[in-house]
Amino acid sequence: MSIVKSKIRTIPDYPKPGILFRDITSLLIDPEGFQLTIGMFVERYQNAKLNKIAAIDARGFIPGAALAFQLGVGFVPIRKKGKLPGNTISESYALEYGVDHVEIHTDAIVPGDKVLIMDDLIATGGTLEASIKLIQNLKGQIHECSTIINLPDLGGAKRIKDTYGIDVFSICEFEGH
């Protein structure tokens, strides 16, 4: 875990002053770090009998698709509103100054599918919470949520566990925001 954490770059004051942006692109361009990261997820979920990996737009797609490929399960993109063609359902989540939406195809989850939800990072948990609601609306069973990074000071993982009873597994944590 410390190897993965050491390969994640921190960019101060991005996207605005006071924010420490945890950038996974430095991890992704490092073959050892990226393979180790996906290997850790494979080890955790290889016996979970998952049907689908649902990953959140856009950085969640990278580990999500790699893990789905390794496990031989379906990959479901959860996208920002207006990016998916065809029939979709959407769910809103709060932003610092407003509201945004994510959506999923209505046929992406079959009732009873065992689903892992993935993103690159959990902060407040807003996008994961909206994704949980989407999967539950389609009658999927959420096995767990999984991220590369947890920012525990922002409380998202705890809120997901307390509100939905769903664990959030993260490979590494960073203090602050």
Curated annotation (Swiss-Prot):
GO molecular function terms listed in the Swiss-Prot or TrEMBL record: adenine phosphoribosyltransferase activity
UniProt cross-references to SUPFAM superfamilies, sorted A to Z: PRTase-like (SSF53271)
The keyword Glycosyltransferase is assigned to this record: yes
UniProt xrefs under Pfam families: Pribosyltran
GO biological processes: adenine salvage; AMP salvage; purine ribonucleoside salvage
Domain of life: Bacteria
GO annotations of cellular component type: cytoplasm
Self-association and partners: Homodimer.
Protein name: Adenine phosphoribosyltransferase
Protein species of origin: Leptospira biflexa serovar Patoc (strain Patoc 1 / Ames)
Phylogenetic placement of the source organism: Bacteria, Pseudomonadati, Spirochaetota, Spirochaetia, Leptospirales
